Amino acid sequence: MITTVQEINKWRNLCFIRMQSRKWYPVLKKTPLVADGRKIIKHADKVPHPGEIIHPFYQPTAIEQFTACATEYNPSLLDGKKIAPSLIKHPVSLKTILVDSKLKFDDIRGVNRWLMEFVARRQHQRNIVLTPASKSVRSFHVLHLSSTDIAKLRGLENVLSEIENTNDLQSRVESVNNELQNIFDRDSKQTRLFCEDILAYLIKNYGNSTENLILLINVTEMQLFSRLDQMKAMNIILYHILCKVEANENPPYSPTLVTALENLLAAINNRFFPGRCENSLHPIVIEQLLSYFIITGNLNESKNFLGHLIKKGILPEATIINRYLEAIDVHFDKSTKIFDIRSKFAFIADLAPIIENYGTIDLFKFLIPMCRHFDELCSLLNIIRKSNNAKQAVDSTLPIFIKKVLTFTKDPMINSGNLSTVFNIVSPIYGQNVPSEFVEKFILSFALQGNYTMMAHMIDTYKIKLSHKYQLQIIRALKNSERNHALKNTGAVGYNKEFKKYFIEKYLNCTEREALRP
């Protein structure tokens, strides 16, 4: 039995040597989530197995699947661009690495089988049902201490008071640990006192300062190797510790507190399990740890606990998911660089069932900038269209979708086609009566492409009133179009000089017409 500070420190050092390569959770050492540009290897040109793709919302449409199966030479999805985030095995080291893969096949053979498995996996994600964790914390609050038991703790309470102003943490820990030992020695084998009840009582009543909480966390770690021999007991203690952390401290947390708590977590992991022990943690404690790691900016641990909750069929609170997404954005500084987007996909891969069935407006807003191909954007828009809060979500995200559509290519005809696709997807949500504020945004986007036909069609169909201010916006957009696409599609139907002349004469006032004269 380990009872002294010297013994615990010796044991901890041995554990540290053993755990250097694995820490609290070893898997992430083998699967680095933050992408390393040096690991983008030629092997990524090979089409990955459907199970290696970690994209959480891309679903090829029936037309995309048909086109891929009907193309004899180099059939592809996402135009064969290297934008499918995947976890693949390095061909030499056999380590798992994060890469952007091409979904471009050598020939038509096996494409149908590949698509069937990929679609089946996406369907499985859609069918996952998640339910919120029970918020009953009664089992954590029921401490099995009678008034007689509490009276036996007077000596321990006195020790805590006496050492309050002592700066030497090690001596304070040893004093409390020795008094705990005295209590159990006096009470002999007939004791009704359990170590977890005593520690939970002390944390609840004396852990109101950071210093005391750090002290009690260290005492808990020492007791792991003597009287705390069940994970059920550790669930109770961790619950009270994490409640105090949240109540006592405003982020950022004290580095000393963070170190003490993470040392305790590592010791728990090593004491009861050779690898990962979250399977034995209560869902409420897992949510607490998830919140804690999000606040401390530990994205790897946050991802682990979030993924564990989802695999257990538990739906995390929307506020927790939002904080997790904010932490990702903070870490990557809302970057849209290729490396950063790939890494972001790794951190949200586990969110697929939530995106499919429980998506929130904040989640959808986070995902839109991550789309690197129009087909990804359509997949996301179709998920929103089928969601329970479709109208509210589209109201909040449609302007972002419209803006994003124009970032995939500079070709005005392709952009016009993509804008029309988005409009056709969202129109049924409004019963074909798309609000004029959104129609006006579509018109301005068509103006940026120099598409006079679609502008005229939408103005007439939705009876858009062309105020002086709005006409000036259209003119500015058309001028930008002429600068950006001066040599493109000038003779195409809907874009040529005849359509331009017709649009100017019918829809613009005399004063505005002159601004567009050659």
Swiss-Prot record:
Please state the protein's primary subcellular location. mitochondrion
Function summary: Required for translation of the mitochondrial OLI1 transcript encoding subunit 9 of mitochondrial ATP synthase.
The protein in question is named ATPase expression protein 1, mitochondrial
Any idea which UniProt keywords this protein has?
A: Mitochondrion, Transit peptide, Translation regulation
The cysteines covalently paired via disulfide bonds are none
What family does the database annotate?
Belongs to the AEP1 family.
Give me the gene this protein comes from: AEP1
Query: GO CC annotation: what is one?
Result: mitochondrion
List the GO molecular function terms: translation regulator activity
Lineage top rank: taxon? Eukaryota
Q: Name one Pfam family in it.
A: AEP1
Please report the organism this UniProt entry assigns to the protein: Saccharomyces cerevisiae (strain RM11-1a) (Baker's yeast)
Q: Where in the cell is it found?
A: Mitochondrion
Q: Where is the transit peptide?
A: 1-19
The reply on keyword GTP-binding is no
Upper classification of the source organism reads: Eukaryota, Fungi, Dikarya, Ascomycota, Saccharomycotina
